[in-house]
Amino acid sequence: MAELTEVRAADLAALEFFTGCRPSALEPLATQLRPLKAEPGQVLIRQGDPALTFMLIESGRVQVSHAVADGPPIVLDIEPGLIIGEIALLRDAPRTATVVAAEPVIGWVGDRDAFDTILHLPGMFDRLVRIARQRLAAFITPIPVQVRTGEWFYLRPVLPGDVERTLNGPVEFSSETLYRRFQSVRKPTRALLEYLFEVDYADHFVWVMTEGALGPVIADARFVREGHNATMAEVAFTVGDDYQGRGIGSFLMGALIVSANYVGVQRFNARVLTDNMAMRKIMDRLGAVWVREDLGVVMTEVDVPPVDTVPFEPELIDQIRDATRKVIRAVSQ
């Protein structure tokens, strides 16, 4: 039995959800789980049911469907390696969505006691909260937007799976682009990308722009407060190589301004490479005065402009503000 536990614990440690956990730390949890095997189309969780269990998916995709009163269900694909069913357990509330196996699924099922074991693993409570918040936020409809060149893209808050899409997606972020963004010649690590994409939407808010409603991420923009509920936040942008020079960064700044006003951020600061002229021009429009911070690096602080200065149609401003409100309300429930 001990040998079987060690094998299962090692299998658990291989899941993306348990990144950083040693197999030995997962042995108590392994004894509390039972095997899961599901065929395509099988309902694993039903919206509205009591929350008694969670599931860890080793292989196979599942689809999470959230029924809404005023429209069709909103569907999100969840890749293997992650947990499902955690939101209702964290909130001690009925299921918030229906989960169906999209492919043959193999994994494990755990009860509330097993979930409590996970919560007591170092760092796992915060990880669970971030995942749950993002899944609630996933039920926000992407906003179709038109940039300076007349092209249409989609704007939405960052969602689960964007780490994988950025690492392995079709949109190229060249060494030069990454250098300007991260001030390093090395490709950002998965750990850094997980920090950048696993956010709380209140102190760390990220908009992404996609090619098509379900398409790849082509750009992102974020603000990160200097402390909980602080009025100062750092801003940063990344735009895929083939999408630069189209006004996407300027558009994303407008969206950040709307969201920042909503959450009470009053000043932005930015730390950029001296030759990152695209970012500097965006900040210059807000009245930036640049100060050298280090060799090849400059920084600035600017006031967050009022929303009525953003060059968007009132309807679009309302959509961005509404999406900000919904995502923050979702994660605070």
From Swiss-Prot:
Disruption phenotype: Disruption of this gene abolishes acetylation of USP. Substrate binds at residues 237-239, 245-250, 276, 285. PROSITE patterns: CNMP_BINDING_2, CNMP_BINDING_3, GNAT. Its cofactor is Mg(2+). Catalyzes specifically the acetylation of the epsilon-amino group of a highly conserved lysine residue in acetyl-CoA synthetase (ACS) and of the universal stress protein (USP) MSMEG_4207. Acetylation results in the inactivation of ACS activity and could be important for mycobacteria to adjust to environmental changes. Its EC number is 2.3.1.-. It comes from Mycolicibacterium smegmatis (strain ATCC 700084 / mc(2)155). The keyword DNA-binding does not apply. Signal peptide: none annotated. Pfam families: Acetyltransf_3, cNMP_binding. Mg(2+) binds at residue 211. This is Acetyltransferase Pat. PANTHER family: CAMP-DEPENDENT PROTEIN KINASE REGULATORY CHAIN, CAMP-DEPENDENT PROTEIN KINASE TYPE I REGULATORY SUBUNIT-RELATED. It is an enzyme of class 2 (transferase). The keyword rRNA-binding does not apply. The lineage of its organism: Bacteria, Bacillati, Actinomycetota, Actinomycetes, Mycobacteriales. InterPro entries: Acyl_CoA_acyltransferase, cAMP-dep_PK_reg_su-like, cNMP-bd_CS, cNMP-bd_dom, cNMP-bd_dom_sf, GNAT_dom, RmlC-like_jellyroll.
